[in-house]
Amino acid sequence: MDKSGSPNASRTSRRRRPRRGSRSASGADAGLRALTQQMLRLNKTLAIGRPTLNHPTFVGSESCKPGYTFTSITLKPPEIEKGSYFGRRLSLPDSVTDYDKKLVSRIQIRINPLPKFDSTVWVTVRKVPSSSDLSVAAISAMFGDGNSPVLVYQYAASGVQANNKLLYDLSEMRADIGDMRKYAVLVYSKDDKLEKDEIVLHVDVEHQRIPISRMLPT
């Protein structure tokens, strides 16, 4: 008797037929596995550059140089008339200035626009000798001499610009923490009056690590 026509044989034959979409599903699985491997490799690569206790992140965007950390200070410019200027010298905390011979590698300024911001400002950081003042005329000349980078930050109808950082490299100057009192942040309000509640400036000073007291205050 020929069993090929039996119900069991028919069911076996049906099971052995490739189901529709099995090949495309297999391809999708392979693609997913490949993507997973790529993500794992990327994650491993990124983990190498992630900050650690001994290698902190400088300004939340890149790692400090080995052996360095950073100190942040906040500046709130006052009201600045259209076409006028503002300058303020850097003032680091006493806990940092106590180690005035520690080298400084970079200064970074971050502009944080507040909800009312609708202006155009120019921002820079400059070494200003203690004998020099921060008058409007003096600051105007510093903006025009081209001796330091200038960040132009402005309001746009679609939102404020993404680039809000200015990086000033001091590594070749061998500047130290004690020199920071000779540096000043300068602001120029170009197109209109800058109100005092329009921007906040965050200044990050990357410097060599300083000793940390392990004793609790008594």
Swiss-Prot record:
InterPro entries: Cucumovirus_coat, Cucumovirus_coat_Asu_sf. It is found in: Virion. Belongs to the cucumovirus capsid protein family. Capsid protein. Probably binds RNA and plays a role in packaging. Pfam families: Cucumo_coat. The N-terminal arginine-rich stretch does not seem to be the major RNA-binding region that allows formation of an infectious ribonucleoprotein complex. Residues 1-30 are annotated as: Disordered. Keywords: Acetylation, Capsid protein, Ribonucleoprotein, RNA-binding, T=3 icosahedral capsid protein, Viral nucleoprotein, Virion. GO terms for molecular function: RNA binding; structural molecule activity. The lineage of its organism: Viruses, Riboviria, Orthornavirae, Kitrinoviricota, Alsuviricetes. The modification N-acetylmethionine is found at residue 1. The keyword Acetylation applies. Signal peptide: none annotated. This is Capsid protein.
